């Protein structure tokens, strides 16, 4: 069973780390929008255009792999309804199921430490305020007709991969 998995969560919530771990376990292809966006920096594009084009590239790559029968993981925060809707629509008319995992870290200190200590790309944030974090950390847009899985990624060593793999393999917890 192929799937399109949209990762969601505040920067520093370990979306990329979890996406890579899932890819190792399942053979899915990870498309990291930050890498695409970062590669485009030298072209002098306005921030809004850079964001739109990087999303377009992300979803075109995802479509290519889904159409080829591969499972795909899209690594992006999912703060905008249209991004989630685009992921859902991408599965229409394919054999891929739509899946959604939100990485949630209820501690500002953990996220701030991760942001400041990671090897970040130029397009990634390196810090946030406590006010901004608590205002937005749990505001990822979720799909309307899907069962989303929320994973506490505060302690990466305690993530239950069996639950995640079961969710990904369960056709009843996704749709196409």
Regions found by a protein language model. Give the residues of each.
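Conserved phosphate-donor/acceptor-positioning beta-strand/loop module used by diverse small-molecule
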Residues: 94-115
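Glycine-rich phosphate-binding loop used to anchor ATP phosphates in small-molecule kinases
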Residues: 53-94, 98
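Conserved substrate/cofactor phosphate-moiety recognition/catalytic segment
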Residues: 17-68
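Hydrophobic anchor at the beta1->P-loop junction of P-loop NTPases
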Residues: 7
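Conserved glycine(s) of the Walker
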Residues: 14
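The conserved Walker
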Residues: 11
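Small-molecule kinase domains that catalyze NTP-dependent phosphoryl transfer to phosphate-bearing small molecules
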Residues: 120-162, 176
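Walker A (P-loop) ATP-phosphate-binding motif of ABC ATPase nucleotide-binding domains
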Residues: 4
């Amino acid at each position: 069973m192929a799937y399109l998995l949209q990762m969601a969560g505040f920067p520093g919530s370990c979306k990329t780390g979890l996406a890579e771990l899932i890819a190792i376990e399942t053979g899915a292809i990870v498309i990291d929008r930050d890498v695409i966006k970062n590669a485009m920096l030298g072209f002098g594009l306005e921030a809004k255009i850079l964001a739109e084009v990087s999303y377009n590239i992300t979803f075109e790559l995802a479509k290519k792999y889904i159409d080829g029968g591969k499972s795909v993981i899209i690594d992006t925060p999912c703060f905008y309804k249209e991004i989630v809707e685009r992921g859902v629509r991408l599965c229409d008319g394919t054999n891929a199921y739509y899946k959604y995992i939100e990485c949630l870290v209820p501690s500002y200190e953990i996220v701030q430490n991760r942001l400041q200590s990671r090897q970040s790309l130029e397009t990634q944030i390196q810090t946030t305020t406590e006010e901004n974090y608590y205002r937005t950390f749990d505001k990822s847009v979720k799909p309307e007709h899907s069962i989303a899985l929320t994973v506490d990624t505060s302690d990466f060593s305690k993530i239950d991969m069996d639950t995640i793999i079961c969710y990904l393999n369960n056709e009843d917890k996704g749709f196409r």
